[in-house]
């Protein structure tokens, strides 16, 4: 019985860690793409680009905070 409980808890922990790593990689990839988009469009609509990127960043931070509260 103890082996089964340990295996179940360990499997759940591994699942949470892999989900957390996957989400962090998505957030990092989206932040890198947003930074590249901001550099390319800096001359034309910098205020709108900044606002859009800032809004995306805030949403990503909220998602990360929510997921951390669930996973930790």
From Swiss-Prot:
Instruction: Tell me the protein family, please.
Output: Belongs to the glucagon family.
**Where in the sequence is Isoleucine amide found?**
27
Q: Which GO terms describe its molecular function?
A: neuropeptide hormone activity; peptide hormone receptor binding; type 1 vasoactive intestinal polypeptide receptor binding
The protein's matches in InterPro entries, at most eight in alphabetical order, are given as: Glucagon_GIP_secretin_VIP, VIP/GHRH-like
Record has Secreted as a keyword: yes
Gene3D superfamilies per the record? 6.10.250.590
GO biological process, any: prolactin secretion
Q: What does this protein do?
A: PHM-27 is a bioactive form from proteolysis of the same precursor protein, that causes vasodilation. It is a potent agonist of the calcitonin receptor CALCR, with similar efficacy as calcitonin.
Classification lineage: Eukaryota, Metazoa, Chordata, Craniata, Vertebrata
Q: Which is one Pfam family of this protein?
A: Hormone_2
Gene Ontology CC terms:
extracellular region; neuron projection
Additional observations: X's at positions 28 to 44 were included by homology with the human precursor sequence.
User: In the UniProt record, does the keyword Secreted occur?
Assistant: yes
Q: Which gene encodes it?
A: VIP
| Major subcellular location class | secreted
Subcellular location per the Swiss-Prot or TrEMBL entry: Secreted
Question: Keywords in UniProt for this one?
Answer: Amidation, Cleavage on pair of basic residues, Hormone, Secreted
Q: Which residues carry this modification: Asparagine amide?
A: 72
Name by which UniProt lists this protein: VIP peptides
**What organism is recorded for this protein?**
Oryctolagus cuniculus (Rabbit)
